Amino acid sequence: MSGRWSFRPRRHERLSRDETIVSRHGPLPEMGSGTESSLIVPVLSAEDIVDGLRRRLDPSYATMPAHITLLYPFVPPSSISESLTEKLRELLAHFEPFDFALSEIGWFGDQVMYLAPSPRAPFVELTSRITAGFPDYPPYGGAFDEVVPHLVVGEGARRARMRGAARRLQRYLPIHGFATEVLLMSPSPSGHWEVRRRFPLGRVRRQ
């Protein structure tokens, strides 16, 4: 394992291994089966604001930080090799760090409440560059024509509860962020996600 984060279950909290995300296009594939990895942008600047809501409303709270997913599913954990790592490192080094803001609350049906990043273009471009380099791994298995960048705040809770949370959250927007790295994550046998590799943005090697 590489990196300083290991997202273990917090005491007194039950984890769900059936973490189905629902989009406006229909249900997305289950995340966290143990056979696939994920590439994410962590959004640590949002945690002080969204942690309390995620703890109550998001089943993945105990196993993942606040984040925006770039690509899932990605390679099986057993396929995370040095050659794959180097390819990702070189690809992401050509993408400069960027500012963004979480300024709007969005919904996938009544099941998922999320924060939408603005601008969304850098996240879309990152996903496009990664999938161009790894065409066997389209976002969500190629299930959708468009994948919307988002930070999940609540999933699967009662509608009234999530609507109330959205009203409270609105007072704290926008939340400003700065994307500096991409994390390659994979689930451990115990169910929590671990950082396998870190890829800084914008560090092109000079000859």
Where in this protein do the model-derived segments appear?
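Basic, often amphipathic N-terminal segments
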Residues: 3-99, 107, 119-180, 193-207
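Short beta-strand segments and strand-loop junctions that repeat across beta-rich extracellular domains
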Residues: 180-189
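Short strand-connecting beta-turns/loops that link adjacent beta-strands
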Residues: 110, 189-190
